[in-house]
A protein has these predicted regions:
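Catalytic cores of the polymerase beta-like nucleotidyltransferase superfamily
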Residues: 1-269
Length: 269
């Protein structure tokens, strides 16, 4: 069977970054894969097999063409041509292939876009964002985590279709926002998202943002919708940090009542 590593792992390999999530595209169907691989085939209807080999998480998908979208779920047909498969992906930097011998194959100019630090949609960006508005947040996430610029045509489409992100589930929004808030460029990126009007659509505001290496410490600085999907532990940690911030100083009382961890995080803010 024809198989390639594709997506973020290859992009990060080129950037000399560590990555533990591996996406493999193959000409084999899930039924064929399960004859020689053991994994979770619960997504078999989507042509996918998940394998956990700590520290790696491996997703294997059959080459496919996406025919239509319904609430982010595409109708697909399985194909045998990897060149057609990569056309369905979001950005050129995520469509570079690596074969079994470690050779890099780039049909869409992704390597040059990595060199140029450019986030560029594959094909028509208007169609890409209408099909799946999550791609808008993914573009902004890569802008934050990779410190790349967004291609002009891609940015124009983001501005045109940004309202569509309001249709996304809060869980998917949080997954992307988590990564943005933990990025080195978080302040610059959040200011950029504010300028684009993205944060207004998401119902997120802030007066001042200070980068801290703690997710709850970042969220504690934001005003968020009441239904934002935090875990109970996250909710508790955020409320504690906000309580200390409102108190206005770090003293022995804060350390005694809340512990050194919360005192240190809040002290950085």
């Amino acid at each position: 069977y024809e198989s390639y590593i594709v997506g973020g792992y290859v992009r990060d390999f080129i950037l000399n970054k560590k990555s533990y999530d591996i996406d493999i595209a193959t000409s084999a169907t899930v039924k064929e894969m399960t004859t020689f691989l053991s994994g979770n085939a619960s997504s078999a209807h989507y042509g996918a097999l998940k394998i956990s080999k700590p520290p790696y998480n491996i997703d294997i998908t059959t080459f496919r063409r996406e025919l239509s979208y319904q609430k982010r779920n595409p109708t697909v047909c399985y194909i045998k041509d990897v060149k057609e498969d990569i056309l369905r992906r979001d950005f050129t930097i995520n469509a570079i292939l690596m074969d079994k011998n470690g050779n890099i194959i780039d049909y869409l100019g992704g390597i040059q876009d990595i060199r140029d630090k450019k986030i560029k949609c594959i094909g028509n960006p208007n169609e890409k964002f209408q099909d799946d508005p999550l791609r808008i947040l993914r573009a902004l996430r890569f802008h934050a985590t990779l410190n790349f610029n967004i291609d002009s045509a891609t940015l124009t489409a983001i501005k045109k279709y940004k309202e569509l992100i309001s249709t996304l589930s809060k869980t998917r929004i949080k997954n992307e926002l988590d990564k943005i808030l933990l990025s080195e460029n978080v302040v610059k990126s959040m200011d950029y998202m504010k300028k684009l009007g993205i944060l207004k659509i998401l119902g997120i505001t802030y007066k001042k943002l200070v980068k801290v290496d703690d997710l709850c410490g970042m969220y504690a600085q934001l005003e968020l919708p009441n239904d934002f999907p935090f875990t109970k532990k996250e909710q508790s940690n955020i409320k504690t940090i906000q309580k200390i911030l409102k108190y206005g100083k770090i003293d022995n009382t804060v350390i005694y009542e809340h512990g050194l961890y919360f005192a240190m995080i809040t002290g950085l803010i």
